[in-house]
Amino acid sequence: RATRLCSALVLAAAVPLTLPAQQRTSPKQFFGHDIGADYELPNYSKLHQYWIKIAQESDRVVLDTIGLTEEGRPQIMAIVTSPANHRNLARYKDISTRLAKAEGLDSAAAAALARDGKVIFWIDGGLHATEVLGAQQLTETLWQLSSRTDAETVRILDDVVILMAHANPDGMELVSDWYMKESDKLRRTTGTIPRLYEKYAGHDNNRDSYMNALAETRNMSAQLFIEWHPQIMYNHHQTGPTGTVMAAPPYRDPANYWFHPAMITGLDLVGAALNHRFVLEHKPGLTFRQGSNYSTWWNGGLRTTGY
């Protein structure tokens, strides 16, 4: 669970920004400003248009509509990987499903499937619409993954199928439109929104993942638990702890003892890789364990239901 740092910057930690790129329309060219520019919040309609454009321009990106929202908007998910992997997506999806269900698999068969498959990596953003960075980082990350040609990005795209899902289109449309309606930039705020930024649940849409009462939750759950079964899922938020930049695994002790230890240590491995990279690049601000209030208990949110 990230805090005040987009996953685009996690990728940016991996490679310099001054790299040759394929010719793709940049966010600045499309929106008129960089993602994250002060006093600018594109709405979901504009984000959707931009994602369509990137999918048209890039053979690394396929745009899928995973369902409709409670207000009838298309909820989109970008599938990002190498062109060669796109030609074999059905096979990699099947491998991921077989490994997740583990029906009739012994250790040798599972190891063989793991060698043949690709990592399925889920990134969602925008679940809590007033945590505006979540939806914005999806767009920045999509552009970087579709345009970079450095060796590390190419390797990532060869090894990984990245699923980038917008978690709350209705909320983004409402919050961005409300914010941008004020002509005086210094008076723009998300603090006076007149209604819920998810039609029925508002901020509590992150308490729905074990019930699937909301259309948006059902759309994402179908991708997570029926279609793709990703091995890693990154559920982006933008909130405390105060004084930090990002919270990551390992989570607070004690770990949930109902889970297989390998699941917990797998989370810890991902967090250790993040922490190690930030340390090497002299980028402070990552916190974990008792430094944050996030744990592996209460398994009803988008992140924790996946456990």
Say what each PLM segment does:
Residues 21-307:
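Structured catalytic-domain cores with a bias toward divalent-metal coordination
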Residues 6-18:
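Bacterial N-terminal signal peptides
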Residues 1-2:
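N-terminal secretory signal peptides that target proteins for export/translocation
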